[in-house]
Amino acid sequence: MRKLTILGATGSIGSSTLSVAKQNSDQFEVVALGAGTNVDKMLELCLEWKPKYVAMATQPAADELKELLSAHAINAEVFSGEDGLCHIAQLDEVDTVMAAIVGAAGLLPTMSAVKAGKRILLANKEALVMSGQLFIDAVEKYGAELLPVDSEHNAIFQCLPQSIQTNLGRCDLEEHGVSSILLTGSGGPFRYTDVSELEAVTPEMAIAHPNWSMGPKISVDSATMMNKGLEYIEARWLFNASKDQLKVVIHPQSVIHSMVQYKDGSVLAQMGLPDMRTPIACTMSYPKRVDAGVEPLDFTKVGEFTFIAPDFARYPCLKLAIDACYLGQHATTGLNAANEQAVAAFLANKIKFTDIARINEAVLHKVCANFQNLELDSLESLIDLDRMARRYADEAINKV
């Protein structure tokens, strides 16, 4: 039986992970739950799952939860802050960690799980975007196991031979006959909207994704296609892919989740309904398969598949991310930080939808001008750069 810590338990991925665990209760035990500040949701989860350990991102949230758990006679040990989240990520009695904290906040807890040699179910793409080679090196050094949860990376993973699956970050695609990885994306809710109308997009419009059920931040990232840009960077690191081996294609139906093209002309595609329980179940049970509770794909109802090349005039954030990917670690760390600040400002109605790309571009240029030769050889140096990029972004937001 696998023993789980779920980081980001109150979010969309956390909910889907618990759904798979419930579907297969004889194979998974939930030992620890970690979350941000959603005390009410965490209380619900604690009442249902009765974890031994819980961590909340802030002390006030942890204190409030402690009182509520005591009132309900739930005897869970409650931790707080980043240290608390890191603690439950490296518990001796846990072998598998779902890393689903959104954004840069997930980097240190995820790295704690890596250093403890856990099986990492990586849903937090920002951790790899921010730390790149440092993360890949740590996985090897500490004997951790890395399995990708993002539907696209999980699809690519499933289409690759086992010798690559067990050597992520260090594999040789060319040696295994892979000519290219085709990273698919839906194009978000505005793929057919006139570019001139994007300035008027509201947060409510941006988070209404046509195919997937996701949290607000990733929904906005999907609308700008920054999500695909971050996934591009993540795929570069996971699969050790060169620029020539990595391509993005828009597939509005979200049925094909990504593809791998081989030298002999074969293309392997992973398909399924757009439901995160499928890739989550794949990583939770790897190399076996378990019931995810997802309806089987009915090809008689799927309809036509369409594929479109991405339009960078419509999706400038995607172009920024692809460019940053090959400029260096300073560029991807800085861009990720800028984007988190810009998306938060947009969701708070402080800036326009189209300002997100402008702010990201301004910060990327500033980071590249000031930190191109910076030695990013530790988590501390990455976090310092992340903070500086956020400061640049906040300055740009205040000027809008």
Curated annotation (Swiss-Prot):
The processes (GO biological process) annotated in the record are: isopentenyl diphosphate biosynthetic process, methylerythritol 4-phosphate pathway involved in terpenoid biosynthetic process
* Binding of 1-deoxy-D-xylulose 5-phosphate, residues: 125, 151-152, 186, 209, 222, 227-228, 231
Annotated EC: 1.1.1.267
Residues that, per the record, bind Mn(2+): 150, 152, 231
Protein origin, superkingdom:
Bacteria
**Quick check: keyword Metal-binding in the entry?**
yes
- Where does the chain bind NADPH? 10-13, 36, 38, 124, 126, 215
Enzyme class, UniProt record, top EC level: oxidoreductase
This entry's Gene Ontology molecular function terms read: 1-deoxy-D-xylulose-5-phosphate reductoisomerase activity; manganese ion binding; NADPH binding
A Pfam family reported for this protein in Swiss-Prot or TrEMBL: DXP_redisom_C
Q: Which reaction does it catalyse?
A: 2-C-methyl-D-erythritol 4-phosphate + NADP(+) = 1-deoxy-D-xylulose 5-phosphate + NADPH + H(+)
Query: What cofactor requirement does the entry state?
Result: Mg(2+); Mn(2+)
Keyword DNA repair assigned: no
The record's keywords, sorted A to Z, are: Isoprene biosynthesis, Manganese, Metal-binding, NADP, Oxidoreductase
Its annotated pathway reads: Isoprenoid biosynthesis; isopentenyl diphosphate biosynthesis via DXP pathway; isopentenyl diphosphate from 1-deoxy-D-xylulose 5-phosphate: step 1/6
Role of this protein: Catalyzes the NADPH-dependent rearrangement and reduction of 1-deoxy-D-xylulose-5-phosphate (DXP) to 2-C-methyl-D-erythritol 4-phosphate (MEP).
Which family does this protein fall into? Answer: Belongs to the DXR family.
Q: What is this protein's name?
A: 1-deoxy-D-xylulose 5-phosphate reductoisomerase
Native organism is Aliivibrio fischeri (strain ATCC 700601 / ES114)
Gene it is expressed from: dxr
